[in-house]
């Protein structure tokens, strides 16, 4: 209802002008009247919107709030555009003004959505008149997932991957050009030990044209780490290998690329299962920019030499001992660290092409434990004047995935759970649930159906269970809860879609004409009002970067539809009620499918 609320805001401002002429307003009165005075109703029985400013104004102008409310309501009723949209305002309690959209407007909005693929969600318009050539004010970079080479993706990567993907989908739908970057950990001292181990254990891989598989890359990493920790000679060789790699030694680069390719294949298997699209641009990409970063910071007199290291001291950043804590930009041995690479990435991403990405907004999706790191890096980038005034840069933090005991989710042996194992178990549990249900219902389905449904439900449940939580909070992982057909779960949403598909299979044409639709039942109006909230919900997600707002809306929509489905006849209704209710079924299905696609969640028509 974004357009409706905007028109109501305009009508309200016109009423304010007549009731409170500009010349008679105090600064406090002006402040109240120019605030956000039109808000969604707190309860359905209060209508669609509320105006609550009469109470604040009463204290300022020393008049009873109901009198003020009555004057505002009177002016609204004389406003032609307001009358076209709303029923007469109702004054409640000490001076609240309740507004209800009239039926004609609601039906008009339903008509519009029936023929609109975007379901009433506006496409964002961007001002390109003053944008420099090759720079776009709608280009957004989302940095998410970012696993480390030679290590398996674990449950900790799940949140960054699916939250980042969902935000990318929403922003793309709103009209932004989104670059999804996978900032993989493909550089650093750990490659010294990995390359040394590879050269000694499987040297043939460096000289063959055939693709050689390292069957267990994780075990390979563990072997190399064990040798590094226990063998001083191996440790020295590994350190030398880091120098060789950084110097561009041909054989070392071949070994490094082989390790990266092996990891990339394993990562892609996970991304394919989760339907994640990413552009890989690892830490190594920024190596060539690191010296320029140091020189720029040095020229701007931001660096301080602290025991041979080049550092920046930020106001308020102190260690556990209370002493100022530096952010090291270049180590005393000349090496660089994560902060240096992240600074180079920020500079490149905000620089106009062809020397950078020309983004207007950077979004980093990582665990909350990195908040301090990014806060420091962002402050340095601002001090260096790398962030244009019209650009945004923000950290999108998320909490831990916990077991049902409230502790960090781990295997029984105390190890971090592999993401592939988590997905496999979700699908297997969904398969077991489906087979039990088929047996209970005496239903027979082929293996292809069972495979498709169990895979879809398993993946959907994993994703939705995460996205439906406020990302800032920790959440408790439970297969039983996420796979349940009851409550705020993916199966509950999918079941609403299945019900609508069932109506279509039973002869309900969801492509019916909307020429003569009419509604009489409260369940119909409840569903209409819920359907019309989609645009404002997506606007919230775009602004707040909280996918759980969309999940909550889809759950409420499914609940509202199920009440409508259970309490109002659809296929057996007489015309025009039958066609009108099929229209609502059609728009509900489209809304659920759109919303779930923005969450990256697959859908079904049969379960």
UniProtKB/Swiss-Prot annotation:
Pfam families: Arg_tRNA_synt_N (PF03485), DALR_1 (PF05746), tRNA-synt_1d (PF00750)
Cellular component aspect of the GO annotation: cytoplasm
E.C. no: 6.1.1.19
Stretches that traverse the bilayer: none
A molecular-function term among this protein's GO annotations: ATP binding
Compartmental location: Cytoplasm
UniProt keywords, alphabetically: Aminoacyl-tRNA synthetase, ATP-binding, Cytoplasm, Ligase, Nucleotide-binding, Protein biosynthesis
One GO biological process term: arginyl-tRNA aminoacylation
Catalytic reaction list: tRNA(Arg) + L-arginine + ATP = L-arginyl-tRNA(Arg) + AMP + diphosphate
Motif window: 'HIGH' region: 147-157
PROSITE patterns in the cross-refs: AA_TRNA_LIGASE_I
Top-level taxonomic group: Bacteria
Subunit field text: Monomer.
Entries under HAMAP family matching the protein: Arg_tRNA_synth
PANTHER family (UniProt xref): ARGININE--TRNA LIGASE, CYTOPLASMIC, ARGINYL-TRNA SYNTHETASE
Family named by the database record: Belongs to the class-I aminoacyl-tRNA synthetase family.
UniProt name for this protein: Arginine--tRNA ligase
Species name: Prochlorococcus marinus (strain NATL1A)
